[in-house]
């Protein structure tokens, strides 16, 4: 069993106030920030310091560009900005989707067949949009 790591330090981002950690990933952490103008909650994905060199940084930049191109789809989060923090780590500011994720909902409640079909259609539509843009997931 692998020990869970601590979250990286959230970067200082002008016009944004750190709120809390949302999740930890293999090459990036995601934080909740409060944006000053316009006032709204945003999710900020930050590349880990250990991933600053080589392929991970290129993949991160590609992800930001691809997500921005796909943001017009209602089931794909909107990218607001992508920058480099003062500490040298790239970050992506994106729409924050509050509420439980699908995995958490599945563990806590029974999802009806009708709801599962609606979710499947929305997911399929998002994947189709990505495929039409040349993205394979």
Language model features by range: what are they?
Residues 46-70:
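AlphaC helix of the eukaryotic protein kinase fold
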Residues 81-83:
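A short, aromatic-enriched beta-strand patch in the conserved N-lobe beta-sheet
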Residues 123-135:
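Protein kinase catalytic-loop region centered on the HRD/HxD motif
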Residues 119-120:
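Activation segment signature within eukaryotic-like protein kinase domains
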Residues 23, 62, 71-75, 86:
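Flexible N-lobe loop architecture of eukaryotic-like protein kinase catalytic domains
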Residues 87-101, 105:
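Conserved short submotifs of the Hanks-type protein kinase catalytic core
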Residues 34-41:
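Conserved N-lobe loop of protein kinases adjacent to the ATP-binding glycine-rich P-loop
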Residues 19-25, 30:
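Protein kinase glycine-rich loop
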């Amino acid at each position: 069993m692998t020990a869970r790591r601590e979250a990286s330090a959230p970067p200082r981002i002008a016009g944004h106030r750190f709120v809390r950690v949302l999740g930890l990933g293999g090459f990036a952490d995601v934080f909740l920030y409060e944006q000053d103008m316009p006032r709204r909650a945003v999710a900020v994905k930050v590349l880990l310091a250990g991933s600053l060199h080589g392929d991970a940084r290129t993949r991160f930049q590609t992800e930001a560009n691809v997500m921005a191109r796909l943001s017009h789809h209602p089931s794909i989060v909107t990218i607001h900005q992508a920058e480099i923090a003062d500490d040298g780590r790239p970050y992506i500011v994106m729409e924050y989707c509050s509420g439980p994720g699908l995995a958490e909902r599945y563990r806590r409640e029974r999802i009806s067949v009708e709801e599962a079909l609606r979710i499947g259609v929305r997911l399929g539509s998002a994947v189709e949009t990505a495929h039409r843009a040349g993205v394979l997931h």
